[in-house]
UniProtKB/Swiss-Prot annotation:
This is Large ribosomal subunit protein bL36m. Disulfide bonds: none annotated. PROSITE patterns: RIBOSOMAL_L36. Belongs to the bacterial ribosomal protein bL36 family. Component of the mitochondrial ribosome large subunit (39S) which comprises a 16S rRNA and about 50 distinct proteins. One of its GO terms (cellular component) is mitochondrial large ribosomal subunit. It holds the Pfam family Ribosomal_L36. One of its GO terms (molecular function) is structural constituent of ribosome. GO terms for biological process: translation. It comes from Osmerus mordax. The keyword Transit peptide applies. Keywords: Mitochondrion, Ribonucleoprotein, Ribosomal protein, Transit peptide. It is found in: Mitochondrion.
């Protein structure tokens, strides 16, 4: 069960790195996720009855405010355009331009960053 939890957490963290939003999770978020992994095995020790009381949540000085205060750092996320991978590249507007770098062909657009493409 512990290996399943570790795989799930690592898959979620790698998925965050590939997402189209550029953001870094709050340090408390990562600590709570990892502390949940370390708390779970103690509850599953053989020969010990599982307690009905939930483990106390980790407290951090910056998290003591309201729920709005805890999620305040999410409001400042700035989306960044990802790169589409295509076999044939096309200019999507008059401001798109081709660039050859590292042996690949790219399309960039300063007017519409969502037009970025990479030849794959």
């Amino acid at each position: 069960m512990l290996t399943h939890l570790a795989r799930t957490l690592s898959r979620q963290l790698t998925g965050l790195g590939r997402s189209s939003l550029c953001w870094f999770p709050h340090p408390g978020f990562l600590y709570r996720g990892l502390s949940a992994l370390s708390v779970t095995p103690r509850l599953l020790v053989p020969g010990r009855a599982p307690s009905l009381q939930a483990p106390a949540p980790a407290t951090f000085p910056q998290d003591r405010g309201s729920l709005l205060g805890q999620c305040q750092h999410l409001a400042c996320l700035q989306p960044c355009a990802g790169m589409k991978t295509k076999s044939s590249l096309k200019r999507r507007c008059k401001n798109c331009f081709y660039v050859r770098r590292r042996g690949r062909l790219f399309v960039f657009c300063k007017t519409h960053p969502r037009h970025k493409q990479r030849q794959g």
